[in-house]
UniProtKB/Swiss-Prot annotation:
This is RNA2 polyprotein. It comes from Satsuma dwarf virus (isolate Satsuma mandarin/Japan/S-58/1977) (SDV). Capsid proteins form a capsid enclosing the viral positive strand RNA genome. Together they form an icosahedral capsid pseudo T=3 with a diameter of approximately 30 nm (Potential). Specific enzymatic cleavages by RNA1 encoded picornain 3C-like protease in vivo yield mature proteins. It comes from the Viruses. The lineage of its organism: Viruses, Riboviria, Orthornavirae, Pisuviricota, Pisoniviricetes.
Length: 1574
């Protein structure tokens, strides 16, 4: 069987020889071969079948390659052409076999073969027929994919067939919509004839001489072959068409002479010169030229020229007569001198070209215009115009010849330059190849010499130690990852017999090496085996990314993967992959290219009117001129590509998606893509750390850094996740490669999974503009075009990485494939969501650099899934400009200019909704109010809404509510509101920006401290809820106007004024800071003025307003979350001082953000928004901004010091000298005072506890909690008879670099003092008896430092429930029910449950009194309840899990969990034992026999839900939906447990009513934040 050399066998013989070899080796482990020695002796050896077949395949491909190169039809010698040639030859062999079958009287088989479908194939002039008999759908699709790949590489055109059934399936009847596949289109056809014709029409450039083997773009051929001959033929026709000459006798005659005739004509000529700024010049402006005066002059015109007497023959006389005949023209195409001016004038008059056209364009115009000279002559004859011998036709021909010669020279010069450039490039390529070959030859020679020397040394060592024992094994030892990949490949692709053969091959290799260690045959055999081994495993590792071959060694190193614990890991150490490095360089280059110049920005929000004209923005700078596409015919179209199929992605494999644009926008001139919207649905289980990296690139650029657009990394959760990627590029649909420009590169990674597993599905859409007119790009417009012209067809995108526009006239291929290599993650994940930065998924237990797994995004390129719009700094009332002075190092100062700039910032904040500080105004300043005006959809000026005059009582307790005003209700009041506020009655959409001005005049030395807070839901009706919200102090000790601005929150930040009575819009609450002024002669009045600022947006609903600012809090409920800077208010406490207070008295403030506001003597605590957030975690890290407000009389003065002691130290035993060594802040005051400063967070373990520890002593109060120490330096001092009582309020107004870690168990929110009995402080916990809890009487204990009213709820002890499926939601009672078959429940899906809503006397929202068996039992221990109830609005994706409580084996555990989402109140909330619930059309899932639980995803809506729901008629809009639960009635099924957990980002906006927790055990108290030292 051995074939020596290249045998001249035909293709059929080669195939037969190969098939015979495989048939002979089938079923054998070894096969004998003959070896011919140098002396002619023949030796027979037994070799493994695997090695024999490898040798056969190598010989087989070598013979086929020789035949392919020798084929005269072969034009391109490369690997892809060889694969296609081999495909066609095999088809030809199949046809030959069919022919032989017919010759051998096997007509039946041939007929069956034809009936199965003989597909025509044409390749280089040959036609083949390929049978599809026995092909399955998988093989047909694979063949189509291979044909499309070949067509893409070679430039073929293929036709896709819409068939749905193969002929071989034998189906005679087809259902509706199915099309049977004809035999000619079962596989895609490749038209070689069209390819050959297009190659002939291409330029005659030598393809083989180019440095690369790609095809050249086709260039139009010049029509220089038949152009001159055509013109000469036309001239010959005109010569032949002359009138026949009349034979006249030749005699000389005299022509009569004629005198010339002249006439005078009066004309007007404009004055072209004028004096401009003292200088004489010629203006170029057409408007100024038309304004210049004209002057008159007399011109002489020659009517008839002088004709002298000429002696000529009679023939000439006849010619002159014919020439003067107006009815007959004769063309004399002789050599005539024609001026260029006359030629241009003639061309313009004929309407053929313009003055500004180039020579090549003029030639194209002449060649495309059907110039009919006879028609022109006839027209002139009809006009009866006398013409000289130099006719117009001759001039036109002369001009045409000159222009053609000029254009031909230009084209020839261009071709010569292009050919020279290609020649130089080819020479440079050859020189580079030669240099690389020389270097490679030197390197290989050096390596050979080193290998020879090493082999010689090793042979000497082996020869010396041959008697000592067997020779060592010097075979190739594969690395760990190579062995793993090879085993996986062998298990999939090899049969058991083949695996056994391969194993025997390696054993025989080792035996032969030991048996004949010193022979050359053994050495060659070992080397050959090592080479084959390396090649085989190189192919197995790189099978997915390299072409299938057995003779090509892998050139790139294997990818780095993580090995299991305890196994050896081979390969290179972890380094940055080439794909990651290229993408990182691309991002850095894109930022540098698109960085705005001085004084301009490419992504600047609008500073002028927000909605100046029908929702269009005008805030572009000059650097964005290339995106300012102006359409000539004003054709504007909002583009949204939605008809895109859903694509599936597999784990660990990068997939590139080219977004087609020509199919829908092929008739548009230009296309501006602003944003790319993607929706990703995860297919993995919740909790698995899996991420998806999505890179968007523009393939029309040469380098990745030029075409890089964005890179986004998403963590895959449950349900659909939507994300918007700003792009901002302009493409041209007429470009032939437009469907391959915009590219999505998607890569999934994370926890190690099996390659090929489906992990996610993706759906994308585009948002932008399409222009039908020809676009133009200009920096400015002419003055004449700006008159009465509105530019309404330009839209500004606020975000986006604007890339320079690129065209592809000279491009051969789009941007090459860029791989994003990665390494799997392990351990817990860490979520990063900074407002102005990036999003990344990092590893918690991995020593390698986590930035190599996924690339961190800069802020200039894109935003992540939860990043907010890059808006300016938030309007925070606690941010002031701080100045330095010698007396006090930290004195707050107010700057009117800075406050005005921050107040006018549009959109507010990305994290905080926005509150601003107050600006002081002089009492003598008279304010001028102008009549406002409205234009379009935005207010141009501030408008006044209403005015209130509030009487201030002379005495008021601390936190007493004085007044509450509903902003929209007061604005819509026809009695008290202003005229302008009545305009809001016809407004459907409103995005308000309120400004409230407070004016209060107090006597000297008096002070009336007031607090103001914005209540979004109107639920802040207790003292603790008002203090825990973001309030502001109004301290008026003299004439001062305080300004308070706020942007109300809502479901979408867009409000409706007509819904003000329903509670949408919020309330303005004014409450007291505690004061007493009994000596006033008359009550004081507080004047409140409400206005709408000019950046308020409103509309009628015809045009949608842009989405407003994002939620003030957004994060994922993971084990660790990085929130960055968060503007969140936490009330720490307040203390009282008076003149008799002890000098040096100390008070401690424990900064435990999760402790809440402790009141009623430690028997109750209120969890606001900040405490609810911190209660979800055990540790926090970062710094915070502390604000201290002193409420004092104007005649009172004093000073305190605030120290920062280290955590874990007993601050009680610090002396004053030791305290002065700590960081401290001095706060003196005279009258009212305020200060804010930043406190750095530090701990000996790097983290602080969010809650106080359970058992602590007086010596170690703070442990790991942050704390403050307040020392009274000077007690409050005042004049005799005055009040010296003051109150100091401590609040945290901002957190910086905040990171939360280690999710906490919610039942351990509070801790007690040592030796006190610990009791579960939470309610609504399911007990086994399922009975109503009994209320207990409470003992009200007033805190001397904080007197608050009693807001208590009943408490009982409870059991701890499991958290296997997330947070506990509710328990639904089952059991027996006479005459009923099913238990049916309807529960509102809301996370804002409160104790007074579903406490001991209510169930759900039906207000039904409880009996002995409680049917529905909600749980307030759910962390979502705690967090979402503290906010005004929330939005989150929820995963509900239903677990059956009962005996599954005895009864059929049938349970249905469904979702009802309809505004029709078809079902009421509560319990029913007779009705039949159905969630058809929505989401539903059922639980059958043998299953223990069922899950249901409830997606979030496009608007936020209210945290507190009071109106049952609006549950559809204020909840996510209604949950339906249905299960069988049986004594074995006691009930069902319902769990819930978030599966995506949690968004919370506004301050709502938090949870108020009370205690009943006398031995248990809560540790307050502020206490007095022992």
């Amino acid at each position: 069987m051995e074939i020596y050399g290249f045998s001249p066998l035909s293709f059929q013989d080669t195939e037969s020889w190969k098939n015979s070899a495989f048939a002979a080796c089938r079923g054998c482990k070894t096969y004998p071969i003959e070896e011919v020695g140098t002396d002619g002796s023949v030796r027979i050896r037994e070799l493994p079948v695997g090695l024999v077949l490898k040798g056969v395949m190598a010989q087989y491909r070598s013979i086929l390659w020789t035949q392919f190169v020798a084929d005269p039809a072969t034009t391109t010698v490369d690997r892809k052409s060889f694969d296609f040639w081999l495909f066609c030859r095999r088809a030809e062999a199949a046809q030959e076999r069919a022919f032989r079958a017919r010759q051998s009287k096997r007509a039946a088989k041939a007929a069956a073969l034809d009936a199965e479908g003989l597909i025509d194939r044409s390749y280089k002039g040959r036609t083949y027929k390929v049978s599809v008999r026995g092909l399955s759908w998988k093989s047909v699709r694979a063949a189509q994919k291979a044909a499309r790949k070949a067509a893409k590489n070679f430039g073929f055109t293929i036709s896709e067939n819409p068939f749905s059934a193969l002929p071989s399936e034998g189906r005679s009847a087809f259902s509706a919509g199915e099309t049977p596949a004809p035999p000619a289109c079962a596989l895609p056809n490749i038209c070689w004839a069209a390819r050959r014709a297009s190659a002939k029409s291409a330029s005659p450039a030598d393809v083989e001489s180019l440095p690369f083997l790609g095809l050249l773009p086709e260039s139009p051929r010049l029509r220089n072959e038949g152009l001159l001959s055509l013109l000469r033929a036309k001239l010959a026709d005109f010569k032949a068409a002359r009138a026949p000459l009349v034979p006249i006798a030749k005699r000389v005659v005299k022509t009569p002479s004629e005198d010339s005739i002249w006439e005078s004509v009066e004309k007007n000529a404009p004055i072209v010169g004028c004096v401009i700024n003292g200088m004489v010049g010629i203006p170029k402006n057409p408007i100024i030229q038309r304004l210049l005066p004209e002057r008159k002059y007399i011109a002489r015109k020659c009517v008839r020229a002088f004709v002298p007497q000429v002696m000529c023959s009679s023939r000439h006389k006849h010619d002159f007569a014919q020439l003067r005949n107006p009815d007959k023209w004769i063309v004399f195409p002789s050599v005539i001198r024609i001026s260029t001016v006359d030629a241009y004038a003639t061309a313009r008059r004929l309407g053929l070209i313009n003055d500004c056209s180039s020579a090549l364009e003029r030639v194209k115009a002449f060649s495309s215009h059907h110039l009919d000279l006879e028609k022109e002559v006839s027209r002139l004859e009809r006009e009866a115009c006398a013409a000289p011998r130099k006719t117009i036709v001759a001039r036109v021909f002369k001009f045409f010849f000159e222009e053609y010669a000029l254009a031909y020279d230009e084209v020839v010069e261009r071709l010569r330059a292009a050919k020279e450039d290609r020649r130089r490039e080819h020479l440079a390529f050859l020189r580079n190849i030669k240099r690389q070959a020389h270097e490679l030859e030197l390197k290989e020679r050096q390596s050979f010499l080193v290998a020879i020397e090493e082999a010689r040394i090793k042979s000497l060592e082996l020869k010396a130690k041959i008697e000592e024992g067997p020779p060592p094994q010097i075979l190739y030892t594969p690395e760990w990852h190579v062995v793993q990949r090879a085993k996986a490949y062998a298990d999939v692709t090899m049969s058991p017999s083949e695996r056994d053969i391969a194993h025997l091959a390696y054993e025989n290799k080792y035996v032969n090496a030991r048996a004949y260690p010193n022979t050359d045959v053994a050495a060659k055999f070992r080397a050959r085996c090592d080479a084959h081994f390396e090649r085989i495993f190189g192919y197995a590792v790189h099978r997915g990314t390299r072409t299938e071959t057995l003779t090509q060694v892998a050139e790139s190193p294997p990818p780095i993967i993580t090995a299991p614990v305890g196994q050896r890991v081979g390969g290179n150490p972890p380094t940055e992959t080439p794909g990651a490095a290229a993408v990182r360089a691309a991002m850095r280059r894109a930022v540098e290219r698109n960085r705005p110049g001085p004084g301009e920005s490419s992504a600047m929000p609008a500073r002028e009117p927000l909605l100046s004209h029908r929702g269009q923005y005008y805030a572009r700078s000059l650097s964005d001129r290339y995106n300012n596409i102006c359409s000539r015919n004003n054709a504007y179209d909002l583009m949204r590509e939605t008809d895109v199929p859903i694509m599936e992605f597999t784990f660990g494999q990068q997939q590139d998606i080219a977004i087609p644009l020509s199919s829908r926008f092929g008739n548009h001139q230009s296309l501006h893509v602003g944003e790319l919207e993607i929706a990703v649905q995860s297919s993995v289980l919740t909790g698995v750390d899996t991420a998806m990296a999505i890179m968007v690139s523009d393939a029309s650029h040469d380098r990745l850094e030029e075409g890089f657009l964005s890179l986004t990394i998403l963590r895959l959760g449950a349900g659909w996740m939507r994300h918007t990627i700003p792009i901002g590029i302009t493409v041209f649909p007429t470009d032939p490669l437009v469907d391959r420009f915009l590219r999505l590169s998607v890569l999934t990674g994370g926890s190690p999974m099996a390659d090929g597993r489906q992990v996610a599905r993706l759906h994308y859409g585009l948002l932008g503009q399409a222009y039908t007119g020809a676009g133009e790009q200009r920096l400015t417009q002419y003055a004449t075009r700006r008159i009465n012209v509105r530019q309404t067809h330009v839209t500004q995108f606020l975000e986006g990485n604007h890339i320079h526009i690129a065209r592809s006239e000279d491009r051969q291929q789009p941007l090459p494939h860029m791989s994003l290599e990665f390494r799997p993650l392990s351990g817990s994940t860490r979520y990063v969501a900074r407002p102005g930065g990036y999003q990344a998924i990092e590893s918690g237990r991995q020593s390698v650099d986590i930035t190599q797994n996924f690339i961190r995004m800069p802020t200039h390129l894109t935003r992540s899934a939860t990043d907010r719009e890059e808006t300016p700094a938030p309007n925070n009332p606690n941010e002031q400009n701080v100045g330095r002075s010698e007396i006090n190092a930290e004195i707050p100062t107010n700057s009117a200019e800075e406050e005005e700039r921050r107040r006018r910032t549009p959109h507010g904040s990305a994290i905080h909704r926005g509150y601003t500080e107050f600006s002081e105004r002089n009492e003598n300043l008279i304010e001028h109010l102008y009549v406002p005006s409205m234009h379009g959809l935005s207010l141009k000026e501030d408008i006044h809404l209403f005015t209130k005059n509030l009487e201030i009582p002379s005495t008021a307790d601390f936190c007493k509510e004085l007044a509450r005003y509903s902003g929209l209700t007061e604005a819509m009041s026809y009695r008290g509101a202003s005229y302008y506020s009545r305009l809001l009655s016809g407004v459907a959409i409103l995005r308000p920006h309120f400004k409230f001005t407070f004016r209060l005049v107090t006597p000297i030395l008096e002070s009336i401290p007031l607090f103001v807070v914005w209540d979004d839901l109107g639920q802040l009706n207790t003292k603790v809820s008002l203090l825990s919200s973001a309030f502001q102090v109004i301290d008026s000790d003299h004439t001062r106007a305080a300004v308070y601005e706020v942007r109300p929150s809502g479901p979408t930040d867009l409000l409706t004024p007509s819904k003000a009575n329903y509670g949408v819009g919020g309330d303005l609450v004014i409450f007291s800071g505690g004061y007493g002024s009994l000596s006033l002669s008359s009550p004081l009045r507080l004047k409140i003025e409400a206005c709408l600022l000019k950046d308020t947006s409103l509309g009628s609903g015809e045009i949608a307003l842009p989405q407003g600012p994002s939620s003030m809090l957004s994060f994922h409920y993971l084990n660790e979350v990085d929130l960055g800077d968060v503007n969140m208010h936490i009330f720490l406490g307040s203390c009282k001082y008076k003149s008799s207070s002890t000098v040096g008295g100390r008070k401690y403030i424990s900064v435990c953000p999760a402790a809440g506001l402790v009141h009623k003597g430690g028997k109750a605590a209120y969890l606001g928004l900040g405490a609810s957030l911190f209660s979800l975690y055990n540790f926090w890290k970062g710094s915070y901004v502390l604000k201290v407000d002193v409420l004092s009389k104007g005649s009172c003065a004093g000073a305190i010091s605030i120290y920062i002691p280290p955590p874990g130290s007993s601050a009680d035993h610090y002396s004053q000298s030791q305290l002065d060594t700590l960081p401290r802040y001095e706060l003196p005051w005279r009258g009212s005072g305020s200060a804010r400063f930043e406190v750095e967070n530090f701990s000996w373990i790097g983290w602080h506890l969010t809650k106080p520890q359970r058992y602590i002593t007086n010596e170690d109060w703070f442990s790991l909690n942050a704390g403050l120490l307040v020392v009274l330096n000077q007690p409050p001092t005042t004049r005799t008879g005055g009040s010296s009582d003051i109150r100091v309020i401590f609040r945290i107004v901002k957190f910086k670099n905040l990171t939360l870690k280690e999710r906490s168990t919610t039942c351990d929110i509070f801790a007690g003092i040592k030796d006190s009995e610990y009791t579960d402080p939470l309610v609504d916990v399911l007990d086994e008896n399922i009975t109503a809890p009994s209320a207990s009487s409470l003992t009200t204990v007033q805190d001397p430092d904080l007197g608050l009213e009693t807001t208590s709820s009943a408490q009982t002890s409870g059991l701890t429930t499991t958290r296997s499926f997330g947070a506990y939601y509710a328990y639904l009672l089952g059991g027996e029910s006479a005459g009923n078959r099913w238990h049916s429940y309807v529960l509102p899906i809301t996370m804002g449950h409160h104790r007074e809503m579903i406490g001991a006397s209510k169930t759900g929202y039906l207000n039904t009194q409880l009996d002995e068996t409680i049917r529905i039992r909600y749980s307030l221990r759910n962390p979502l309840h705690i967090l979402c109830s503290a906010g005004a609005y929330y939005a989150v994706d929820l995963l509900f899990t239903l677990v059956v409580d009962g005996d599954h084996g005895a009864e059929r555990a049938y349970t249905q969990l469904g979702l009802i989402q309809t505004p029709l109140m078809e079902y009421f909330d509560g319990y029913s034992a007779s009705r039949n619930l159905s969630s058809e059309g929505g989401y539903s899932n059922q639980l059958g026999v043998g299953k223990s639980y069922v899950q249901l995803i409830v997606p979030r809506r496009n608007y936020r839900a209210r945290s507190i729901t009071t109106n049952t008629g609006a549950l559809f809009f204020e909840t996510i939906g209604s949950l339906t639960v249905k299960f069988a009635v049986s004594a074995k099924i006691k009930g069902v447990h319902l769990y819930v957990e978030p599966v995506g980002p949690i968004d919370v906006d506004g301050y709502g009513r938090g949870a108020d927790i009370s205690l009943t055990n006398e031995n248990f108290v809560l540790m307050p934040s502020l206490r007095t030292a022992a």
